[in-house]
Every structure is written in structure tokens, then in C-alpha cells.
Design a protein with these regions (language model features):
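Secreted, disulfide-rich extracellular signaling modules
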Residues: 1-407
């Protein structure tokens, strides 16, 4: 029941539809304090609503903000005078958008399922056939008027950019922990996985790679908090080189550049993120290595780009495949909590099924501890792992001359 407050401002410039916006966006660049449209004090539970209504299945909790009357009328006049032709194209120039700011209160998280703008206007009552304005009463000159309303829902076509900030010291403390690793959303910690692609290729020795299974154990968390952070349930394993373009281009997991973990509906307690077959992803890594080796042989060097820990691009030029392997992130993958959108389709014989139609960064607060950590990279003088309990295991199935074997 913590008291909170929202403020809404009108944007003074358009968001570029061709540009990708990240959680470090600076809202100050897009609005002025004087362009305040409205404010609303609220609590997570609206006590003005009776228990009998709140318990109804049809009840939907909401926070409604009434916009400043003068500014709403000014906007209405601009929209009314605008050219009706291709109005949807002209609308962003007339109204660039809004910035919703939480400017009072903490400790409260609202999960927003829908955003809508309700517009109320006054119009003349007309005859449905002739279109002639009707009089309010018989033998009176005064025209009859009525209130009408329209609802405009926010859809995926509307750019929604979120500003998120974390406690950098607390985040870094988690990252520096060598006993395990973390996933934390939103915009917090993504775990990097180093895949033993070279070792797999050496072990195969010409065998056909059939299946590669990766399991990432989850450490159980105990908490007595009623409203604690939940564990991410949908996690994307994606090659590091594609983690930016995947979300910018609204791509789906193809099994080659990425693999998606989604639990079944019957799964209650997660103990492991399991990727049953990342064979195509491993082969994609090997394909990159072969292409790099070929370019080095032909051109004597290769130039490539990587992203550093701050997300900035770094350029590299090397003249041997060993240095390329060391710097290129060719065998690196990232674990990212995601929000998965599905559609529903039915089949008379097999029942209903669903297809993934969208994958986005999960903006719901959540975290989990995973097996791994920097200790898994430590080796003794003979090259053996010092902490084998921190190393993840891959199950590899290959075929050689008609026989199948697991390694």
C-alpha cells in the first residue's frame, strides 16, 4: 500500500522507427518539464474499489490519469484540423508520444498488460440516413449534441522505450562472485557460456555430429518474502555475435544462431535450463572458424569486430587462427531471460497447440543463480580443472560408420 505517483509528459520529438532504443535511453532528451499532461497518486491496491467488485472475474485493476483539460482540447483541435488523408502518417507529427514517469514512491512494481488512451468528445446528433443535424426538441432551433468516446490501444507497432537503472555496485559484486553465476532481469546480468567447440571437433575426428545437449543446473533459492523476485522461466541461449541484431530485428529462435528454453505447462519447479539439441548452433560456430581460417590462409590476416563488456564495438586484426579463436568470441553464447509471445491454433484430432510469434527481453524483475562461475576456468599446471564441480557438462552423440556413440 505504498503511496506512489505517476506523471505524464508530452514528447517534443518523435522516436525514430528505424532506430533501436535500449534501457539506457535518456528521457530528458525527449520532453520538457513544462509539457506536463497530468499526474496521479495511486497504490498497488485501489482501496476505493470494494472487495466484492475486486473479487469479480471481470474486474481489471487499473491506474487512470485524467489529462490536463486545456492541453487535451488543444491537441483535439490539432487533430480535428489535420488532413484526413493518410492521417495515420501525419499523427506522429501532431502528437509525438508520451513519457510516463514514476516520480514518487518505491518498493512497488506494477505489471502492465495494456495501455490505452480514452478520448471523449462532443458531437452533433444526426439522422442516420440523411445526415441532417437533429434538434434537441421539436420546434427548437438548438441542435442536439451527445458525448462519444473512442479507445486507442497501445500495440506492438507503437515504440515503447523503457529507461531502467540498476545499482552498479551490487551488480558488479554479483558478477565478481566466482562460485556461481547469475541471471538478473531486466537489463541486469546475462551469463556468458563458453562452448567447447574445438574439443568437440577434436573428439569427433571425422564422425558425424548427431546431437549436443546442454544442461545448466539451477541453484534453489529460499525466501520468506511474499513478493520476492521470481525465477526467469524462458531463457534464450544465443551466440554472442547475434545478441544485438536478434532483438533489433524482432527475430525468432531458429536453432542455428540461438536456442530457446521454454518449460512445459506442467513444470512447477525448475531445476535446470535444458537445451536438448544445439547441434546446429555448434556447427554454425565451426562454420565461422572454417571461414576465418580460409581467409587467413588466402589474405594472410583477418579483421573482425567484437563487443566488449560495456557493449561497445572493438576492432581486431590477427594473422593466425589461434589469435582469432582467442579474440573473436566465436564459441561464446549468452543466456538472456526473454518474454515469449505465442498464438493458439487448434487441431480437431491432436487438440490445441501454440507457435512462438515473438521474443523480447523480459522486463519483469527476476533472478536466478546458476552453476558455473569463474572458478570453472581455473586449471592446474597440467591443464586439469581445479574446480571440476563448477564445470558444466555437454552430452554429445555422434555417428561413425553406422555406429552411434555418446561422448
Amino acid at each position: 500500500l505504498t503511496a506512489c505517483r505517476l506523471s505524464i509528459y508530452e514528447l517534443d520529438k518523435r522516436l525514430n522507427e528505424e532506430e533501436a532504443y535500449y534501457t539506457n535511453i535518456n528521457p530528458e532528451d525527449y520532453y520538457k518539464q513544462s509539457d506536463l499532461l497530468g499526474t496521479k497518486a495511486y497504490t498497488a491496491v485501489d482501496l476505493s474499489v470494494s472487495d466484492s467488485i475486486r473479487k469479480l472475474d471481470t474486474y481489471v485493476p487499473s491506474v487512470s490519469i485524467r489529462l490536463d483539460q486545456a492541453k487535451a482540447e488543444k491537441l483535439g483541435q490539432k487533430l480535428f484540423k489535420a488532413d484526413r488523408k493518410d492521417f495515420y502518417k501525419a499523427f506522429p507529427d501532431l502528437f509525438s508520444g508520451i513519457y510516463v514517469k514514476s516520480d514518487y514512491g518505491d518498493g512497488t512494481v506494477l505489471y502492465i498488460s495494456q495501455v490505452q488512451m480514452d478520448v471523449v468528445s462532443i458531437e452533433y446528433v444526426t439522422d442516420s440516413i440523411t445526415g441532417i443535424k437533429l434538434k434537441s426538441k421539436v420546434n427548437e432551433e438548438k441542435d442536439s449534441i451527445q458525448y462519444t468516446g473512442r479507445t486507442f490501444n497501445s500495440t506492438r507497432e507503437i515504440i515503447q522505450a523503457n529507461r531502467l537503472a540498476n545499482d552498479t555496485e551490487a551488480i558488479q559484486k554479483c558478477i565478481d562472485n566466482s562460485d556461481w553465476t547469475y541471471l538478473k532481469s531486466p537489463a541486469g546480468i546475462f551469463t556468458q557460456v563458453t562452448l567447447p567447440v574445438s574439443q568437440i571437433a577434436e573428439k569427433l575426428e571425422g564422425d558425424t555430429l548427431n546431437a549436443v545437449k546442454l544442461g545448466i543446473p539451477i541453484y534453489n533459492e529460499t525466501s520468506d518474502k511474499k513478493f520476492g523476485m521470481s525465477m526467469p522461466r524462458n531463457v534464450l541461449l544465443i551466440r554472442k555475435k547475434y545478441k544485438e541484431s536478434f532483438f533489433e530485428n524482432n527475430q525468432l529462435s531458429d536453432g542455428v544462431t540461438s536456442s530457446l528454453f521454454t518449460p512445459t505447462s506442467s513444470t512447477t519447479n525448475l531445476t535446470e535450463y535444458t537445451y536438448n539439441n544445439i547441434t546446429k548452433l555448434i556447427n554454425d560456430c565451426l562454420k565461422d572458424r572454417a571461414a576465418a581460417d580460409k581467409e587467413i590462409q588466402e589474405k594472410k590476416s583477418i579483421t573482425f569486430q567484437t563487443f566488449n563488456d560495456e557493449g561497445k564495438i572493438e576492432n581486431h586484426t590477427v594473422n593466425n587462427i589461434k589469435d582469432w579463436e582467442e579474440l573473436s568470441d566465436w564459441n561464446k553464447a549468452i543466456l538472456i531471460p526473454v518474454l515469449v509471445t505465442t498464438d493458439a491454433s487448434s487441431n480437431g484430432y491432436y487438440g490445441s497447440s501454440s507457435n512462438v510469434i515473438g521474443i523480447q527481453h523480459d522486463l519483469k524483475p527476476g533472478y536466478v543463480r546458476l552453476k558455473g562461475g569463474l572458478k570453472g576456468e581455473e586449471k592446474d599446471s597440467q591443464g586439469n580443472p581445479v574446480y571440476p564441480e563448477n564445470i558444466l557438462k555437454l552430452e554429445v552423440v555422434s555417428t561413425n560408420f553406422g555406429s552411434t556413440k555418446a561422448k
